[in-house]
Amino acid sequence: MRDKFFQLLLTTAIIFTQQSNLKAQEALKLSLTSCREMALSQSESLQQAEYKYQQSRLDKQIASSAFLPKFEASATGTYVFPDIDMMGMELRMRGTYMAGITLTQPLYTGGKIMTGKKLSKLGESIAAEQKRMTMMDVLVETDNAYWTLIAVRQKVAMLESYKEQMDSLFAQVKTAVEAGLGTENELLRAEASRSDILYQMQKAKNGEDLCRMSLCRITGLDSSTELELTDTTIYVKEPGLLTADINERPEFNLLKHQVNVTQQQIQMSRADMLPTIGLVAGYTYYGNIKLNSLVDAGNGTMMPYSQEFRDGLGAVMLSVKIPIFEWGANLKKVKKAKLDFKNAELELSRNSRLMNLEAQSALKNIYDGYQLIQTAEIGLKQAEENLRVTNNKYNVSMALLTDLLDAQSQWKQAKSNLIEAQTQYKIYETNYLRAIGKLDPTSSPNANNNLFLTE
């Protein structure tokens, strides 16, 4: 009796634990916007881009400080032995100290400081564009994973509906065979079709699980987290007048900045051929320097005498440095910088054509994707009507089983085509925004973005 009581208690505890786990594993509701926010917040690549941007801002501040004077302080202690003999006198420097402060102000550096500041500003702009480019890449990956998961789940739901049709048909054929109104061949055909649907469902569910884990990885969730996507209904209207302008694309701006960088590098190389002028001012205080000697006190008496030196000195210096001859090295540096500038221009020209082609391709995908949706919708309506008519004819023995199976297969394919067309269109929208450089967390097509006429 006691053992049964403990078994009952253990069973109750296990059931309670399982119920608690089921509650804890309730599906997490996610919209496309929330997925984007989560992906951006946990992206290591975006965090690295942010740190590089902060570094570029510090570099700009460092470059600006080159215009300002620099102050340096120094202190020195010296112990010299033995004492230094100076024409019968001894110079004692045991514990001598010096302390001073120096001010250095560049007056002219051939334009290096100004060029360095311009380069630091370009570096900040480059880091900002790289950060924006990384952000876009994260959004593209997130959107692709989101819409792919929706497509797979809709296909699973479609296959489940198809399976219900096949189960009903199989039961109907089986009843007819048992009543002597059908053949075993028809039953085998129905059973084979039902087995094929089960196989396709298993494949689709496996793909769904992989897509879910991929989205969990992108958003920083545990791979076992169940997800409930909210943006499952897709309404699409004809897109408006769109352009393939790449001027806002980060890659295009990066190439333009690179051209400007190489142009400034030419000025930096020329600065090596120009004189530099600097002003140096300093003040030094020294002490504990002693001079020991013997002096005549009168009557031929020599008495020891000691004097300690303790004073401060100030100095102002103007430094001028003029490069005279370096075997043409600086001139060759200028020529090399000019070649880098020409290469950067060629790189900009070549990649601009490629980016224009990519933007035009993305634009074409938008219009083609919309046409595919229209075609798929018409095909689905026709397949649904064909299935309805064929099913009615089969019920009154005016159509063969193979005709009904073909009609069901056509409906499945038409439904699958529409799912693919709709979800692929949403991916095309994201890719288009990426291609023209206007993709950001707020440019969601679901938010009635002005680039797309979506409901």
Model-derived segments and spans:
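Periplasmic alpha-helical coiled-coil/stalk elements that build and connect Gram-negative outer-membrane
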Residues: D137-P250, N260, N365, G369, ...
